From Swiss-Prot:
This is Large ribosomal subunit protein uL30. InterPro entries: Ribo_uL30_ferredoxin-like_sf (IPR036919), Ribosomal_uL30_bac-type (IPR005996), Ribosomal_uL30_CS (IPR018038), Ribosomal_uL30_ferredoxin-like (IPR016082). GO terms for cellular component: cytosolic large ribosomal subunit. One of its GO terms (biological process) is translation. Belongs to the universal ribosomal protein uL30 family.
Length: 59
C-alpha cells in the first residue's frame, strides 16, 4: 500500500457532525496539522467524506 500525507486545510466549524468525527478519526485537530497514513479502502472513503477540508499527497 502507498503512504499518503493528509493535511487539514480548512476549519471544521460549520461542518456536519459526521465530517467532524471523520477529521478527528484521521488524527487531525488543528488547521495545518499533517498526518501520514497507509492508503486503504477505508481511508480512501474517509478522505472522500472530507475532501473539501483536507489536502492529500502521495509519499
Amino acid at each position: 500500500m502507498a503512504k499518503v500525507s493528509i493535511k487539514l486545510t480548512k476549519s471544521v466549524i460549520g461542518t456536519k457532525p459526521n465530517q467532524r468525527k471523520t477529521v478527528e478519526a484521521l488524527g487531525l485537530k488543528k488547521i495545518g496539522q499533517v498526518t501520514e497514513k497507509e492508503m486503504t479502502p477505508q481511508l480512501r472513503g474517509m478522505i472522500d467524506v472530507v475532501q473539501h477540508l483536507v489536502e492529500v499527497k502521495e509519499i
